[in-house]
Regions:
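Active-site core segments that coordinate phosphate-bearing ligands/cofactors
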Residues: 13-184, 192-197
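Gly/charged, well-structured mid-domain segments that form the phosphate/adenylate-handling core
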Residues: 3-5
């Protein structure tokens, strides 16, 4: 049986009694302020090296297909399962931005100054380039011809659009059938990336 994150046991150390509680995974811990304060159902997307999408309101058991697509249950602070999916977002971003920066001869951090352009974004949405067949082994599709773009900014826009599209597939895995979340909370480094958001 799962133990609530609010359960404590008294133990004695060096003649003193202290209360010791259970630990929870950092992803589960990130849910706590929202579980305590949000009034309506939500889906939490915690971004960093991994993108962890967590739906504490989806109580459906994991299917074989979801397990194959890297879904799992975390436990919330109350010991209840939280349907979650994982996507290697930050790592994919780092690998591809490094490749783009090297090809175009710019600093790795150049992606931070690429501004959002609605027209460029619409063109990027109309095509899939970097992940035509999903995420390739080794994370990079070497058949993508980077010389198709006239600079780092448009290439990055296409990449981040394609990456976001792949990430949304991971988010979709934890939505309830016919019961989409009205509130999506994005935390972590990618919450500051305007092109991702």
């Amino acid at each position: 049986d799962a133990v609530s994150g609010f359960h404590f046991e008294p133990i004695e150390i060096n003649g003193k009694t202290i209360r010791v509680g259970t630990g929870i995974h950092d992803s589960s811990a990130s849910l706590v302020p929202y579980l305590l304060n949000e009034r309506e159902p939500f889906l939490l997307v915690s971004t960093g090296t991994w993108c962890i999408s967590m739906n504490p309101f989806n109580h459906d058991p994991l299917t074989d297909e979801e397990l194959k697509k890297d879904c799992l249950h975390y436990l919330n602070v109350y010991g209840k399962p939280v349907k979650s999916s994982r996507f290697f977002l930050g790592h994919l971003h780092d690998v591809h931005v490094s490749r783009l920066a090297e090809f175009f001869g710019v600093d790795y951090k150049s992606y931070r100054s690429v501004s959002f352009d609605r027209d460029v974004f619409e063109k990027c949405l109309a095509q899939k380039v970097f992940f035509k067949e999903g995420i390739p082994d080794g994370y990079i599709d070497k058949s993508v011809d980077l010389s198709a773009w006239d600079g780092f900014a448009p290439a990055y826009c296409q990449f981040i659009t394609d990456l976001t599209r792949e990430c949304s597939k991971s988010i979709d895995l934890v939505l309830n059938e016919g019961n989409e979340r009205k509130k999506l909370i994005v935390t972590g480094g990618f919450s500051r990336n305007q092109k991702f958001m």
